[in-house]
Regions:
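Non-catalytic, glycine-rich low-complexity segments
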Residues: 33-65, 114-124, 131, 285-295, ...
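Ser/Thr-rich low-complexity repeats and stalk/linker segments
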Residues: 34, 38, 42-120, 375
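Beta-strand-rich ligand-recognition modules
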Residues: 75-98, 332-384
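C-terminal beta-sandwich/jelly-roll accessory domains of carbohydrate-active enzymes
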Residues: 77, 576, 583-668
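Short, aromatic- and glycine-rich surface loops/edge beta-strands on solvent-exposed regions
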Residues: 98-108, 366-367, 628-634
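An acidic-aromatic loop/edge-strand motif
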Residues: 111-178, 209-292, 358, 362-440
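Catalytic cores of secreted or luminal carbohydrate-active enzymes
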Residues: 249-286, 505-594
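Aromatic-lined ligand-binding clefts that engage carbohydrates, nucleic acids, or primary amines
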Residues: 281, 308-336, 365-367
Length: 668
């Protein structure tokens, strides 16, 4: 987009219009960047933004080759010349922290960016748990109501996957307030609690640049150059390059283009409309495989609906929709309003019905489901499908629904070749969402991701460091801080010691935080939900990321880690574990110190007794007379019992180096 479409050259244009409104869209909702003029100023710079304090800032855009562009802010200025491709980039020293300031950019046009603050800028990246909104978090309604922080700003980078580096991001800067943080396009709960904790101590403005896409593995955020040395992603990289050269859709997801072309349920009045007459639709039992619809083994896009009744008055509080596991993708609506969507994962669906969605009396829930496998569809048990109101009242959702196939994959509308690979192909989010915001000046990054890599946890030890190094090279600001949210508890607890990929992912995250310079792990093993991969307790993770930053970057003397295993001492009939980070001493939460297991030379694990002795834990078991190795909290959903006096939990660990169950697993 050109900013002079509504004003003459050399006049002053206001960069306050949301970028999305001016972008031409391809089928699938992807911006036609190649067809549209490039903007004079990149949309990552706008009204209400935060500049990074204490270091040179880059600002860029596009003009005619050879044009000079002058940037002024505070008492500083810089001049840039547009290159052969029209891109100009100026670097300038920011004014002191605070504001507000106005940035004036003068060339063939003049643009003013107003209400600009100077402080600390953080990238907040990952998958759906980083994107999880503040309004959905525990006490979300109250948190949103209290979110009046004019010194906190955020920018949601529009979700986009691409086969080639993108120039122009989608999004706009917003001030944190009750009217901006809730709902679609609102603030990440984890990022919000992180920024609020930081701002309380450092007293400077905080800018959050949110880069989050649900269900994606870490390799989507790394470049091909970073992934090639790992040798695990060669097939995906080759396919990416093949598509780049074959002239396929430049952006987005082949399957979404297929949706948009053939899904009659989304055209001319959505099938999600609660007023739609579905009496002619086929009755079917949910959970089930849609066999009543006669689609057989053919992949299909099916819409299903059912009615449910709610009391008057509705109880207060956030309602949740539980749908069990669904294969393969779904979009869920209540009374015509989208309440959730999941792509390319088969985890249990749990969505939130924000205030105003539900009503007393008749309600309609509608799902659009892309079923890929012959035995796909709804995979859960009947009692997993339910609506839980704010007071705990349960409305069953299993049983009779009505369904209609919008399109199946038989000719003349077969699925496109390779449809299954996006948006999980290597590098597509790095090119689609990170490339257009680099080299934005920043303090560091926070990262909440790993769920989609748990089955390859051992590979993650090499993958995530490669991605971190790639980001540091992309932004060109040295080894900036990179702080990680550890995986919370998930799934149901095992009553016996087990091998577990989630435990191995937590071990990988701990390994990375210690191995990669200027990184830190915020352990959240004391949070989580056995039935929901998207737990509502985001405050703990966000604030613990803040402790990481305060201690490791700002040099404040604050505890940031729970007890950390430092030394293993093998005694006759017992193992003694020595811990660092025992701030205020070791503390037991719960009835007793639990979740320890031991094994001898036979490598068979048994639950153990554990007791505190100063800053050590003594572990033993009558089933293992000569214990050699110890594990703590080694399962997907352990009971966290070991803490320090600062209230921070110990990270799950093991003393053995026996082969992990995820060793050798790759993306291929």
């Amino acid at each position: 987009m050109k900013l002079d479409l509504t004003c003459a050259p050399k006049s002053i244009c206001r960069l306050a219009v949301p970028v999305m409104a001016a972008l031409t869209l391809l089928p699938g909702g992807a911006p036609a960047q190649d067809a549209a003029p490039l903007p004079f100023v990149s949309p990552i710079f706008g009204d209400k933004m935060v500049l990074q304090r204490g270091k040179p800032n880059a600002i860029w855009g596009w003009s005619q080759p050879g044009d000079q562009v002058r940037v002024e802010v505070g008492e500083g200025s810089a001049i840039a010349t547009a290159g052969a491709d029209g891109r100009w980039q100026a670097r300038f020293q920011p004014p002191p922290a605070g504001g507000p300031y106005t940035i004036k950019i003068t060339g063939k046009q003049t643009v003013e960016l107003r209400e600009v603050l100077v402080g600390d800028v953080w990238i907040c990246a990952g998958q759906s748990n980083m994107g999880f909104g503040l309004g959905q978090a525990r006490n979300g309604a109250e948190e949103v109501k209290a979110a009046d922080h004019p010194l906190l700003r955020f920018y949601n980078v529009g979700q986009r996957s691409s086969y080639s580096p993108v120039d122009v991001p989608r999004g706009s800067w917003k001030i944190v307030s009750p009217t901006t943080v809730g709902g679609f396009g609102g603030i990440s709960a984890t990022a919000y609690f992180f920024a609020r904790k930081l701002q309380e101590s450092v007293h400077v403005p905080i800018g959050l640049v949110q880069v989050a896409v649900g269900g994606v593995p870490a390799e989507t955020f790394a470049s091909a150059a970073a992934l090639r040395p790992l040798k695990d992603f060669d097939t995906g990289i080759a396919e990416l390059e093949r598509r780049r050269h074959m002239g396929g859709p430049q952006y987005g997801n082949y399957i979404m283009h297929w949706y948009d072309e053939f899904d009659v349920g989304s055209k001319n009045g959505s099938w999600a409309d609660p007023a739609l007459d579905d009496s002619s639709w086929t009755k079917l039992q949910i959970p089930g495989k849609f066999t009543e619809l006669g689609v057989g083994d053919v992949p299909n896009l099916t819409w299903i609906r059912r009615e449910f009744t709610l009391p008057d008055p509705l109880p207060p509080g956030m309602a949740r929709v539980y749908l069990g596991s669904i294969e393969k993708m779904d979009t869920t609506y209540i009374n015509g309003q989208q309440v959730g969507a999941s792509s390319w994962v088969e985890n249990p669906r749990v969505y939130f019905a924000r205030p105003g969605v539900l009503k007393s009396g008749r309600n309609i829930i509608t799902l659009r489901v892309f079923k890929l496998k012959p035995d796909g569809g709804f995979l859960g048990k009947p009692d997993e499908l339910r609506l839980t109101l704010g007071d705990g009242t349960v409305i069953p959702l299993s049983g009779e629904w009505r369904g209609k196939v919008a399109v199946d994959a038989r000719p003349p509308h077969p699925l496109p070749p390779g449809f299954e690979n996006l948006p999980t192909m290597p590098g597509v989010l790095r090119m689609g969402m990170l490339s257009p915001i680099a080299p934005l000046s920043l303090t560091g990054a926070i990262w909440y991701q790993g769920e989609s890599n748990t089955e390859r946890a051992h590979q993650y030890r090499r993958l995530l460091p490669a991605m971190i190094a790639d980001w540091r090279q992309l932004f060109g600001q040295g080894d900036f801080p990179f702080y990680i949210v550890g995986m919370p508890a998930f799934k149901h607890r095992s009553e016996v010691p087990v091998e577990d990929s989630w435990a191995e992912m937590r071990e990988a995250q701990s390994f990375i935080a210690k191995a990669v310079p200027h990184s830190c792990l915020a352990v959240t093993i004391d949070t989580g939900d056995p039935d929901n991969i998207h737990p509502v307790d985001k405050k703990e993770g966000g604030e613990r990321l803040g402790f990481c930053a305060l201690s490791e970057h700002f040099g404040r003397k604050v505890p940031y880690s729970g007890p950390d295993l430092e030394k293993v001492e093998r005694l006759p009939g017992a193992v003694k574990l020595h811990f660092g980070h025992a701030d205020g001493g070791l503390v037991v939460k719960g009835e007793k110190l639990a979740e320890f297991s031991v094994a001898g030379d036979d490598r068979k694990w048994y639950w153990a007794e554990a007791r505190l002795e100063g800053n050590t834990v003594i572990v033993s078991s009558p089933s293992v007379p000569n214990p050699k190795e110890v594990r703590y909290a080694w399962q997907a959903n352990p009971a966290a019992t070991l803490f320090n006096g600062a209230g921070l939990p110990a990270s799950p660990f093991r003393t053995d180096n026996w082969p992990a169950i995820t060793e050798g697993r790759t993306s291929q």
